[in-house]
Amino acid sequence: MNFTRTRRLSFGVGLISLLSGSPLLADEELSLSFLDKNDFYLSSAGFKVQLANGPKGEKALHALPPHRFVIHTANGVSRYLFADPKRCICIFVGSKDNYLSYRSILSQPLGAAPNDVEADYKTNALTMLNAPMGGKDIYDPDSLSEFLQDYY
């Protein structure tokens, strides 16, 4: 009887740990080598690079979640934004077509990987295939419009 009680307690603690740790997995940082490749994929898909130099750029970069797609709409025009505060310190700006092209590039099978390719590449790629966030999640959307006015 004591064994059964201990087993239930262990299961309960394990389940709570698993459920409370799940949000942390979603925020797992992407590897630097994946981010290098990802910048190339974004550019190949037609995303334009807007360097976040200067006060407006820094404000816009910090208003976006790092390494996540966000759909931002201003003046009836929607743009897909991807902030990269680690590698290029920039925001990639593109259309829905650019985003779909990017997803197509990322979804293609890699084939045989050389030994120097990180084992977590597939996990990183799957993370990037998550649905983009809506613009309503951005803290101060006007700061983005001001910085990215060339794209609207």
Please annotate each region the language model reported.
Residues 2-12:
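Bacterial N-terminal signal peptides that target proteins for export
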Residues 33, 97-152:
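C-terminal partner/receptor-binding element of secreted or periplasmic proteins
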Residues 26-75:
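N-terminal secretory signal peptides
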Residues 67-111:
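Mid-chain, structured segments of secreted extracytoplasmic proteins
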Residues 10-21:
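Bacterial N-terminal signal peptides
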